[in-house]
């Protein structure tokens, strides 16, 4: 007699992608715009967070539009983190677009077109629409199917509220929709008369004691009051860019999903602006100025900066937040130097927020938050060592060592990350300073190693040539 084998079932762990700023939930400020020491994933940068909170409050109140804010500071001081915190605090109702400055350089469209699309993605249009809906509890559904199976299906639907009940005749499409949504007696549904869309709101409270199997996600609600047929105002928020795409191509709405948008004619945008202005005057729509965040803004050239000067003066312009880690450097496309690599006429239009380098205490707290975010158990002395590494090298390098040291700990079947695990990955992966030192020590062994000629060297060579002549 053969013994049946029991197969072992492995647990499938859920894969979660953890980004560099996935631990940030907001700016971490209270109602009086005072930054908390540790809140919503944000640590330190008290002055910068307070300034960003003030800007955030003005954005929410709609008091400023067409303003630009520059976040400047050294690499690894949390510039992008502050922008992401602002995006999280604004919520989903306010459009937020984040791009890198190098994204606008493309062979398929011009630089100004890419910037225009980014600007219009950041401007929302909140459209109000009145619709007639039928809302009530399903009392009975009767569907008559033809015996031959070839004719059209007909049926009747009985709905009720606390005040009245009504009987509706059903066509074939409505019967299919009810079947698709698995509507049954006791469900509370809402039907949009214009589109025929059926929405299940939940189950009636009168059916709680019924002997039926219901899942944990079933929502029991009271029977609706008043009339079955009602008028309700629905609000839809779309960006100006989405309206541009729908009106710019023959395929219309499907161009949103195709991805191949290309350049949009200025005439189309002008017509859309006029239409939106009409809706605004009639009270059908309102403009929602959002936020456009451009990281590494020093990568833009002089033509892009000239476009930004003009775009910020437009009536429908979002809040522009730009970030850079450069000091006095050359403006791209010119031979002139300027602070942050930005022309002085644009700098004059900016509100500038400076970020300060993190202290050792701040780095310790940030690394602790990142360990919790990545579900890594780490010993206290190992965390102290990681903090010391972060102070001597960079915060990003220390954060990268968290995951790699966790993998080393798992391989040795440890429960948490120890000092030895940190030392092992520190030896395996070098930081920028050690890599630079290695290159200097062994530069003769590398191919094409040469020192760039300086102006002084060239001048000395020219003088020697003249003396020889």
Swiss-Prot record:
Gene3D superfamilies: 1.10.8.60, P-loop containing nucleotide triphosphate hydrolases (3.40.50.300), RuvB-like helicase, domain II (2.40.50.360). GO terms for biological process: box C/D snoRNP assembly; chromatin remodeling; DNA recombination; DNA repair; regulation of transcription by RNA polymerase II. It catalyses: ATP + H2O = ADP + phosphate + H(+). One of its GO terms (molecular function) is ATP binding. The keyword Membrane does not apply. Keywords: ATP-binding, DNA damage, DNA recombination, DNA repair, Helicase, Hydrolase, Nucleotide-binding, Nucleus, Transcription, Transcription regulation. It is found in: Nucleus. It comes from the Eukaryota. GO terms for cellular component: Ino80 complex; NuA4 histone acetyltransferase complex; R2TP complex; Swr1 complex. ATP binds at residues 73-80. Its EC number is 3.6.4.12. InterPro entries: AAA+_ATPase (IPR003593), NA-bd_OB-fold (IPR012340), P-loop_NTPase (IPR027417), RuvB-like (IPR027238), RuvB-like_C (IPR041048), RuvBL1/2_DNA/RNA_bd_dom (IPR042487), TIP49_P-loop (IPR010339). SMART domains: AAA (SM00382). Belongs to the RuvB family. Forms homohexameric rings. May form a dodecamer with rvb1 made of two stacked hexameric rings. Component of the chromatin remodeling Ino80 complex. Component of the RNA polymerase II holoenzyme complex. Has double-stranded DNA-stimulated ATPase and ATP-dependent DNA helicase (5' to 3') activity suggesting a role in nuclear processes such as recombination and transcription. This is RuvB-like helicase 2.
């Amino acid at each position: 007699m053969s013994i049946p084998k029991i197969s072992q079932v492995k647990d499938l762990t859920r894969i979660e992608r953890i980004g560099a700023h996935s631990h940030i939930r907001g700016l971490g400020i209270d109602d009086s715009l005072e930054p908390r020491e540790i809140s919503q994933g944000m640590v330190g940068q008290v002055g910068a967070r307070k300034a960003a909170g003030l800007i955030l409050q003005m954005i929410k109140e709609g008091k400023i539009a067409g303003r630009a804010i520059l976040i400047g500071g050294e690499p690894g001081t949390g510039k992008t983190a502050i922008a992401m915190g602002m995006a999280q605090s604004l919520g989903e109702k306010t459009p937020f677009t984040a791009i890198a400055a190098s994204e606008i350089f493309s062979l398929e469209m011009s630089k100004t077109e890419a910037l225009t699309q980014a600007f219009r993605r950041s401007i929302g249009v909140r459209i109000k629409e009145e619709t007639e809906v039928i809302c009530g509890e399903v009392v009975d559904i009767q569907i008559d199917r033809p015996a031959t199976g070839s004719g059209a299906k007909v049926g009747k639907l009985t709905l009720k509220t606390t005040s009245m009940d009504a009987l509706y005749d059903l066509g074939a499409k409505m019967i299919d929709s009810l079947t698709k949504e698995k509507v049954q007696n006791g469900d509370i549904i809402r039907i949009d008369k214009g589109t025929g869309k059926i929405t299940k709101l939940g189950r009636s409270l009168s059916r709680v004691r019924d002997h039926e199997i219901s899942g944990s996600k079933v929502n029991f609600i009271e029977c609706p009051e008043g009339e079955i047929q009602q008028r309700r105002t629905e609000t839809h928020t779309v960006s100006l860019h989405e309206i541009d795409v729908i009106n710019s191509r023959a395929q219309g709405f499907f161009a949103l999903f195709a991805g191949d948008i290309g350049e949009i004619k200025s005439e189309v945008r002008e017509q859309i602006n006029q239409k939106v202005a009409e809706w605004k005057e009639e009270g059908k729509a309102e403009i929602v100025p959002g936020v456009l965040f451009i990281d590494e803004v020093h990568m833009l050239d002089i033509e892009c900066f000239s476009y930004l000067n003009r775009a910020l003066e437009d009536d429908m312009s979002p809040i522009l937040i730009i970030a850079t880690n450069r000091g006095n450097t050359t403006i791209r496309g010119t031979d002139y130097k300027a602070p942050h690599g930005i022309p002085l006429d644009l700098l004059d239009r900016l509100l500038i927020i400076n970020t300060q380098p993190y202290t050792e205490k701040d780095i310790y707290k940030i690394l602790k938050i990142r360990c919790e975010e990545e579900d890594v158990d780490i010993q206290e002395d190992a965390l102290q060592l990681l903090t010391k590494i972060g102070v001597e090298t960079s915060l990003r390098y220390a954060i990268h060592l968290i995951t790699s040291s966790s993998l080393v700990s798992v391989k040795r079947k440890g429960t948490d990350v120890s000092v030895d695990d940190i030392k092992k990955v520190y030896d395996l992966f070098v930081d920028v300073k050690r890599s630079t030192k290695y290159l200097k020590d062994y530069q003769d062994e590398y191919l094409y190693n040469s020192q760039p000629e300086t102006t002084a060297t060239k001048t000395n060579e020219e003088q020697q040539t003249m003396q020889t002549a």
